[in-house]
Amino acid sequence: MFTLKKTLLLLFFLGTINLSLCEEERNAEEERRDGDDEMDVEVKKRFISGLIGGLMKALGK
């Protein structure tokens, strides 16, 4: 009975570590995806401001 308890405790401990590592990996992937979205928004803002600036120059001449 004692060896069974040790085995179950070991399995629980290893499962907890594995779950923790999976959560960290998932969080890292989500952060990478969030960073890409922020970059896309920044690129869109630059494009729109450049487009508006170009139109203003063209209309001003």
UniProtKB/Swiss-Prot annotation:
Pfam families: FSAP_sig_propep. The modification Lysine amide is found at K61. Keywords: Amidation, Amphibian defense peptide, Antibiotic, Antimicrobial, Cleavage on pair of basic residues, Cytolysis, Fungicide, Hemolysis, Secreted, Signal. Residues 23-44 form a propeptide. It is found in: Secreted. The keyword Transferase does not apply. Residues 1-22 form the signal peptide. It comes from the Eukaryota. GO terms for biological process: defense response to fungus; defense response to Gram-negative bacterium; defense response to Gram-positive bacterium; killing of cells of another organism. Antimicrobial peptide. Active against some Gram-positive and Gram-negative bacterial strains. Active against fungus C.glabrata 090902 but not against C.albicans ATCC 12231. Shows weak hemolytic activity against human erythrocytes. Belongs to the frog skin active peptide (FSAP) family. Temporin subfamily. This is Temporin-SN3. It comes from Sylvirana spinulosa (Fine-spined frog).
